[in-house]
Each structure stands twice: as C-alpha cells, then as structure tokens.
C-alpha cells in the first residue's frame, strides 16, 4: 500500500491499517466487505507530506494555522503538527474480539 511503515490488526469482524506517520488510520474494512475509508489516489505515502484521506490525527487545531488560537505563524501546516509527526507505538493488546493500540 505504501512506502511508510504500517501496523495492521485483524479481528473476526474487521481489519484495519494504521501508520505511525501521523498516527493515521489508512483503512478499516469489515470482513468480506469493501474498505469503509476513502484514501485519495493522490495521497503521498512516503512520509514527506500529510496523507490525504483516511482518518488523520488533527492536533492541536483543525483547519489552517489561522484557525489556531495560538496563531503559530508562517510555515505551520494545516491541522497542526500531529499529522506529519511520526508516532511510536507504546502498547498493543488484543483482549477478546477487540484490537486496541496506544500511541
């Protein structure tokens, strides 16, 4: 799917794919069904820019830098720094039919 690292989890009801780049949910697919999430054909999946599509982590603001109460100034990206940061997986467990992960 990409040139960036991904983490996958599968439970009886579905499968998911997450990348530590932006802690971004790339895919959620119920078993025997199509992917529920949209990922742009123009998405760059090499870690050089924010991913277009899926479910991004928007932090500390949503929108352009002008929407941030702190007014971060020129060079600040849309939706904050979180979606272009590489996150580290701290824990992963799989009790019963759940698949939680902590970033």
Report residues per predicted region:
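Surface-exposed acidic/polar loop and edge beta-strand patches at domain peripheries
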Residues: 1-103
């Amino acid at each position: 799917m990409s040139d960036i690292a991904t983490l996958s989890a599968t439970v009886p009801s579905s499968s998911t794919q997450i990348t530590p780049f932006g802690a971004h949910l790339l895919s959620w697919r119920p078993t025997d069904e199509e992917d529920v999430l949209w990922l742009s054909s123009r998405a760059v999946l090499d870690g050089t820019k924010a991913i277009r599509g899926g479910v991004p982590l928007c932090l500390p603001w949503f929108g352009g830098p002008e929407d941030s109460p702190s007014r971060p100034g020129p060079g600040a990206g849309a939706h904050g720094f979180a979606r272009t940061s590489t996150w580290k997986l701290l824990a992963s467990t799989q009790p019963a039919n759940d698949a939680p992960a902590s970033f």
